[in-house]
Amino acid sequence: MKFKLFLGSSFFGVATLLIACGTGRFDQIDDGKIKLAVVTSPSAASSLQTLLDQYNNTKAPADYPVEVVSLDSTGSYTKGKFDTQKRLAAKDKNNFYNLTFNYPDLVSSLAINGMELNLDGVNVSNFEQSFLDFNKNISGVRKPGIYALPATMSGEVLVLNGPVLHYILNSAKKKDGTESKIKTAQLKTASTQAEVKGTMTMASDEQTTKLWTNIQNAAKENAANGTTEKAEKTVSASSLQLKNTNKTTEGTLKIGTDDNTKNLWKKIEDAAKTNGEKGNEKQEATQSNASASLVKLDQKNTSQDKTQNTQTSDDEIKKSWGEYKEVEGGLKGYEFKADVFESWEKLNDFAVRVAKSFSKVSEEKKSGSDIQGVFGIGSLENALYTASFAAGGGDYNNFLFNIKKGRADFSNFFNHNSKTFQSLRDIFNSFKPLIDQKGLISNKHFDTPVNNYAKFHQLAFYVSSTARFPYSFAKDNVKRLIIGKRELEVNPKSMFAIKKENGNNGNSNLLGKVALDNNKSIELYENNIPNGKTDAILIKNQTLISALKNPKQTKSSQRSSQSTNTQNDAICYLAFNSKIRPDDKDIFLLDKFGEKFVTAIVNFEEKTEVKINTLQEKEAVVLPAPQKFKPTDPKSVALVQGPSLIGIHANANEDRSTIKFLNWYLNAEVDWKDGEKKTPAEYLAEKASYLLPFKKVLEKSKQNIKATSKEGEQNQGKKGDGAQNQGKKGDGAQNGKNDKAKHNGFCRYCRQPIFKRFCR
């Protein structure tokens, strides 16, 4: 059953290739304009509108102007595809469009109906050819050619939650005897405390060392976000007294001694240290004299300071992740190396070991604020495609499907003796133990993107599109609504609280009122809306009406070492975001308000998260997503994705004008207001922070990578300490802010094609 679930989720994208039925080619009416369909609101497409204004003001008089048509304001490419298929089935000659942004499988639907537009008349020489080759693998296309342009692309990255991973590894790691003085004082005071010595080790290679350094830095950064309420947790008498009753498991995990592992471990440590710094600063004003003397003693040594900072972070993470357990098949005796993150097989094995070592991961009943797993995958289908393609040696003949004679051929998948099927079985067997341990989550089966859970330390690491990376970090004192097993982050710009009304202003139908951020308010009514009222919504669902009339007492809390719970006077939240899935129990979809979908949320617990309980950008360690299934696979596979610009046949005149516009879009050198000359395609990609796979962009990225490598070598030669210099010159997780504007295309730090704003 789990195999079917895994495959069913992963094959959703493939299945869409096969569902369209042809109705035959037809001509649209010639209305003298080119319509470009998008799945965003007009306001969100402001950069695109600026681009079109530039074209319309400078085009030849005989060429048709281009205008934007909004199909869906929520960014749903699925809804955009359904709209296109609906118009194809109806042979809509009057209200169709000429261009649209969507995924290439939409070309299959167009081709089945003979409505694909061959773009061979467009000069595509600026593109790196390999990024156009996907056109050869679109099913249903009869004549080879260019039908979709990869104008808006993103990649995938692996994001490590530095503070969480530091707590996991530090708990399991075999100690080397260099305990901090504070820790020593704690152990002396807690004389009855039982210990179990650990056996996990860190590899000593350079890659692992750098990674561990980054993880340590993330823990430091996390500790820096502590508040005064955490002052007593490290050295106060009450804390020590509490610890007398607990057993401390000291792990046996080994950190690899290779350079890569050393560097990674340093990054992880730094993340934990940063997480603990502010907490320790705040301690000085509130701790007892005895505790203060311990801190003063410890401050004589900088390295001991850093140890305390990571301990502060670890103590906070421990509250949600629980005690480390030294168990067989877990991290007991395990050697941690940085290359564990380079292949799916080794990454899954590591995640299983973590899940077995922390019992909270495998708990049956979880709320939206509990630990959700170890490993999150934003797109299961992308993980399956990448792992399968790598396992097949990067050969389409060994892939899940191939395109033969314009059709998707799945014969390899159904042949149990094929390399494809054997590889797929190995891939599933790699994921199955993690599924069994409840250590894997994905966007497909949860109502919350995986990066949102990592944002609140509920995951250790995750793979996600770079498109979501800018939304992976929490703001100060962020609020969340916990609704059963679900959690929703409160966006103050689109979610507004409704408080219980003391009176109904003489109207018995008034259920509540919400104030928006633009000095307007919206009133909720049952039965009917009074005449003349425009800023109002009619509530029809009787369950919601009952919840608003008789609200349950909701709670408001702040998660910290001294959590407080108070009664919350908010009885409902209105969310102007249709991506929140309704359940007609606690979350209800209302009528549209203007052009916006509105969702009502009741029966929630409101939580305020302080910084030490959230992931900040400096605390993330960013790596390429796994590019192999097994370490021995001959080729590395990096997935790039995103909607393409697709042409749709209309009529001879409009088709001709469409080709002219696309040639301008890809090749014209335009002077923009920022004073830089670039093509419209480059302008839009930069404004929207997408990867544009132009040759010159990729070449510039390669040069930046070479320059960065030389820079790092020089720094190591000058100082003799790559870990220290990493934070100054070559460490994307810690620095790079001054270089932000220099890089486009591939990230100089993680070597992946990504959003420009992701390069820090």
From Swiss-Prot:
Q: Which residues are in coiled coils?
A: none
List every stretch annotated Disordered.
221-243, 272-315, 705-741
> What intrachain disulfides are recorded?
none
This chain's protein is named: Uncharacterized lipoprotein MPN_199
Main localization of the protein described in the UniProt heading = membrane
Report the locations given in the UniProt record.
Answer: Cell membrane
Reading the lineage from the top rank, the first entry is: Bacteria
Residue ranges annotated as compositionally biased, kind Polar residues, are 300-312
Question: How far does the signal peptide extend, from start to end residue?
Answer: 1-20
For this chain, the family text in UniProt reads: Belongs to the MG185/MG260 family.
